[in-house]
């Protein structure tokens, strides 16, 4: 069953697949294993570096553990994005410009 967040993920995946050159990413499926709070998209872009995207449906924010993981990524020199597809894509576009 599709969830509102899955539609946001689909749109972000389409954008990354079709609109961004020199990019590698994956979408981890933790399923109760691994480190909690890991973002929905983990990737690396040439000349920009490591990034993570936490996808949220409209009106929702990251959980405390997701905020913590995003801070850890930023502290290590990575870039994080969170929100709906529209918000994330706009911020990603500004980052790669």
Located regions from the model:
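Catalytic phosphate/metal-binding cores of nucleic-acid and nucleotide-processing enzymes, i.e., regions
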Residues: 1-97
């Amino acid at each position: 069953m599709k969830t509102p967040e899955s539609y946001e993920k689909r749109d972000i995946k389409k954008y990354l697949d079709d609109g961004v050159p020199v990019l590698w990413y994956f979408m981890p499926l933790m399923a109760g294993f691994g480190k909690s709070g890991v973002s929905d998209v983990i990737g690396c872009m040439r000349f920009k570096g490591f990034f993570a995207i936490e996808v949220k449906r409209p009106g929702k924010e990251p959980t405390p553990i997701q905020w913590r993981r995003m801070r850890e990524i930023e502290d290590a020199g990575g870039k994080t994005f969170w929100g709906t597809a529209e918000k994330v894509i706009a911020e990603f576009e500004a980052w790669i410009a």
